[in-house]
Design a protein with these regions (language model features):
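A residue-level marker of the well-folded mature domains of exported/periplasmic proteins
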Residues: 1-292
Length: 292
């Protein structure tokens, strides 16, 4: 469970309000009344990223540059894979056997020399292994940088960075887009509640503003399409986003199995929030570690 440190600090300071983004102490029932947990549903941003990758890939070899391994990062990788799988098979009509989706975890959200794997080396390993799209789950842009170098050297490689709205500006021609968090609206609401004396304990997992996922005033999660995405694929991606928005497409519909064959979502069932939040493994079809 995330949030023991926050909960302990909150108990020691009952007159102070605490906000733990990404935490789940409230969900688990371990947080005191002066704690709020909030998180954006980045799963949607990653589904969009996965779809963009599958639409643009010529080889079907898509790689994911992962940070550390926990429930959050597992569900983000799974969401990326589900988006890629849908757009590869249902939109492009290609066999699932031709989609190769691999994750390598570096061990943290950015490179720490001597501690993590080197994301530059991992990105190059992906490229040398035949991947033509690298999706980043780390906070820095090594995937984009190395895709750009490879493309300049004659290979066509695209990348999808993470969590910085303007990341594509570093190498626009190879950037398919970027999913990102926008915490401003939620923090404004929480601070306003604290000032008004109406702050309440809450665990909120907040969806994008589907009327405009890139509205900085309202949407906690966005996706900026990149210049590397063809016009046709960009239009197709917009249709995919619209299906997520209106609920006509729910990628967490069963049957879905974990890597070891354990049922994750039964046939005909739809995963609830708690099931997704506490994701225990990567999904069947993904190559890579589910646990450290």
């Amino acid at each position: 469970v995330n949030g023991y440190g926050t909960s302990n600090a909150a108990r020691a300071n009952p007159d102070v309000y605490f906000v733990h983004a990404s935490g789940d102490g409230v969900l688990a029932g371990t947080a005191p009344a002066n704690v709020a947990n909030v998180m954006g549903r980045m799963e949607y941003g990653k589904m969009i990223a996965g779809c963009a990758a599958a639409l643009q890939s010529e080889t079907g070899n898509i790689s994911y540059l992962g940070p550390l391994i926990d429930a959050e990062t597992r569900r983000l990788v799974n969401s990326t894979y589900l988006g890629a799988k849908y757009c590869w098979t249902e939109v492009r009509g290609k066999p699932i056997e031709e989609l190769n989706f691999k994750v390598t975890w570096i061990g943290f959200w950015f490179n720490i020399p001597g501690v993590t794997l080197d994301p530059t080396q991992v990105a190059n390993d992906f490229i040398n292994g035949g991947s033509d799209v690298i999706i980043s789950g780390i906070d820095t842009t090594e995937a984009l940088v190395e895709a750009n170098k490879a493309t300049a050297a004659g290979k066509k490689v695209f990348a999808i960075p993470y969590d910085y709205e303007a990341a594509c500006e570093q190498a626009p021609e190879v950037c398919l887009g970027v999913p990102y968090f926008n915490w401003g609206p939620t923090y404004f609401e929480l601070i306003s509640a604290a000032q008004a004396g109406t702050f309440e304990q809450r665990w909120d997992w907040i969806a994008p503003d589907w009327s405009d996922i890139n509205n900085p005033e309202t949407s906690i999660v966005g996706f900026q399409k990149g210049a590397g995405l063809t016009a046709e694929n960009a239009a197709t991606l917009d249709n995919f986003i619209a299906m997520l928005a209106d609920g006509s497409l729910n990628l967490y519909t069963g049957p879905l199995n974990y890597q070891d064959g354990t049922p994750f979502v039964a046939e005909g069932a739809v995963a609830d929030d708690t099931t997704i939040w506490y994701t225990e493994q990567l999904l069947e079809g993904i190559e890579g570690q589910s646990a450290p």
